[in-house]
Each structure stands twice: as structure tokens, then as C-alpha cells.
Amino acid sequence: MKKQIITLTVAALTLSSCGIYTQYKPATEVPDNLYGEEVAVADTVDNIGNLSWQEIFTDPRLQELIEQGLRNNTDLQSAQWRVKEAEAAMLSAKLAYLPSFALSPQGTASSFDKGKAVQTYTLPVAASWEIDIFGRIRNAKRQAKALLEQSRDYKQAVRTQLIASIANTYYTLLMLDNQLAISVRTEKSWKETVDATRALMEAGLANEAAVSQMKATYYTICTSVLDLKEQINQVENSLSLLLAESPHAIERTGTWDSSYMMKEHFPVGIPVQMLANRPDVRSAERSLEAAFYATNQARSAFYPSIVLSGSAGWTNSAGSMIVNPGKFIATAVASLTQPLFNKGANIAQLKIAKAQQEEAKLSFQQALLNAGSEVNEALVKYQTARDKSVYYDKQINSLNKALESTSLLMQHGNTTYLEVLTAQQTLLNAELTQVANRFTEMQGVINLYQALGGGRD
């Protein structure tokens, strides 16, 4: 018996170099130019990836909506239940180290030649315990732990997406509110222009065509006002869904939150920080880690499993009276099962596990590349919109002067109604575009917040 134990111990030590005991080594190297060659990086603690959402989105009303969404959103609640499922699986993997017990009481009654019935009772308890010499249970536990962390990363990704979606929808409403205010103001101004043109026609300084053209443009603006109101209603409904509520009007401040719009640039931190900050990148690495341990499990299937089993129980002797105190029976067995040929299933399973591990590795690499690309796009979007805003301000200032001059010239009969119409229409489009560009600037901030992992809790 001692020789057998020594033999098994030596075999276990020999096989420890075969890969079934190795642990996954987390990724620690990320290309310095992951965000793009033109993006300067710095290892700073105040980069946007380390800020909480409250520090980025400072509008009090928006903060209320985000907190409400974090409490009620159904997608986030589903992600929380997914974490609970993974926690249960992790607990099961931990308990696999413990022995199993089974109790199966039995009773029989028999008689011979119409004699007195004889009752027999048996109360057996069976136990078995797998000794994890070859790492099957250990690797299963490590895989379950990786999957648990992945479920937590998924929950964080859903949370980050929810915060970004609420912020994006809220600022969409503010953009539409501003565009609606501009359109309503223009509608009123255009009505005054129509009345002025009609007065000029009555004075012989304009014709019917001018009045009709002015009216047509005025009606176009009226319909655009209705379109904007419809869009506002649709966006409010979308935000209500994010808050897990039925459609209703959303109260808002009506002003732009510009606390971060005044920055010349955003510090984004160094790319390696994304491994810790961005949940989808972490999740992709957890998938790789789980696949790594699944491959280890597939390798361990080639080695024997050692199970200690035993049983103990009480039975009364057959043919004795019911008051017989009975007998105690106990047995113990150690078994070793060595797989020899399983129709190629173990070999096939190992090949599948290795292939899935390579797939997970490529997915992780692609997740990193996607993340770097998203950071680059968000930075460029923000900076481009910020640069454009300078020119939009100058354009609107020039168009206001042009409209004022053209209107005066028309009143004195020195220009046509078409020039006034063109000046007013161009000014309206420029003002609407300026508001949309301001929204694009804020979108860049939101996208950057999400691209860098959603900040800290």
C-alpha cells in the first residue's frame, strides 16, 4: 500500500510540469500608441478615466436622472442577476473539494410458508471524495472565478452604457429645446417680415410674388416647429424607457452643462490603464482566462481520477425480532480510474478547448484595438466640434449684420425680397447648426467617458 502511495505521489509531481497546474498570467503590456499616434498620453491621476460620472456630468437634474436609472433600469437589474448566477456557480466549484454523502434507508418485509412476517431495516450512508491530484477541480474553480469576474465586468459595462445613454438622451433634449426656441423666435420674426412685405406691396414697393414667397417660407418654419416638438416627445419616451417608466415629459434645466466644455483637452491617461478601467476589455480578458483553465481541464481528462469512497450503516439481522439492536457495517474503498480510449473524445475536447482559447485571445486583442479606436474618435469629435464653434460664432455674427442691412435696404427699395429671404434662411440654418455642433461637442465628452471605461464608481 505504501508503494502505491509513493508511486502516485511521484506521478503527481512529474505531471505538475505538464500544464494542468499553471495559472493564467494577466496581460500587462499595451501599445503606447493604442489611442493613435497624434494623441499625447500621460500617467496622471486626474485623467477622465479615473473620474466618477458625478464629476463629469455636473448638471443636478441630469444627476437625478442617472441615479434614477441606476435604481430602476431593467437591463442593469438583469446584469445583477447574471452576477448572482455566476456567484452560485462559483460556490458550487468551491464545494466540489468536499466529499459527498448519500443516505438511502430501505426496509423489507417477507414471510415463508405463511409464517410470521420478518421485517428487515437498513440505514446505509455512502460517501465519496475525489482527490484533486491532477487539477480538474482546481481548474474548474479557477474557471468559475474568471466567469464570475466576467459577469461583474458585464454588469459594469451595462452600467456605463446606461449612464452614457441617459446623458446622451438628456443633452439631445437640451439641443432640441434650443433648436425649438430658435425656430419659434424665427417663426415670429418671419411673421413680422411677411407683414412688412405685405405693407410694402400695398405701398407699391413689393409685388404679390414676394408676399407669397415669404408666406411659403413662413409655413415651412411652422412645420419645422411641429417636427421639433414631435422629436422632443420621441426622445422623452426613449429616456422614460431608460428609467423604466411609462412615457412622460422629462423635466430639465434648459441650459447646457459646460463645466467640461471649457477644457482645451482631456487627459486620457496611459493605454495600460484601460485594462483596469474598461469593463468590456476586462470581460474579454476574463473570457481568455476562462478558456485557459478550460484547456487545463481538458488536459486533466487524460490523467486518472482518484476517488475515496466508503459506506456505513445499521441493519437489523434478517429473521430477528424488531427489537434486535442490529449490526453496524462499514466499508472503505479507494479507486483509480485511468482513461485509456474514449473514442477520441478527450483528444477532440482538448483540440476544441485550445481552439476556443485562441479565439478568446484574438477577441481580447480586438477589444483592445476597438477601445483605442473609440478613444481616438471621441477625442477628435470633441476637438473638431470645439474648433468649429469658433467659426460658427463668427458666421452667425456676420449673418445677423447681413440680415439687418438687407432688411433696411429692402425697406428703402434698394434690394429684392429674395435677398432678405436668403439672409433669414441662412441665419436660421447657421443657428440650428451651431446648436447641433454644441451637442456634438458634448457627445465627444460622453463618448470619451464611455471609451475610457466609465470612470470609477
Residue spans of the language-model regions?
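Sec-dependent bacterial lipoprotein signal peptides
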Residues: M1-S16
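Coil residues (strongly favoring Ser/Thr
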Residues: T7, T44, D257-S258
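A small-residue-enriched
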Residues: C18-G36, E67-D132, E230, E236-E251, ...
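Regulatory alphaC helix of protein kinase catalytic domains
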Residues: A40-Q68
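Sec/SRP-type N-terminal targeting helices
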Residues: S78, K94-L95, I131-R159, A209, ...
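Periplasmic alpha-helical coiled-coil/stalk elements that build and connect Gram-negative outer-membrane
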Residues: A146, D153-I270, K381, A385, ...
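Short segments within alpha-helical structural elements
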Residues: T220-H248, K394-L452
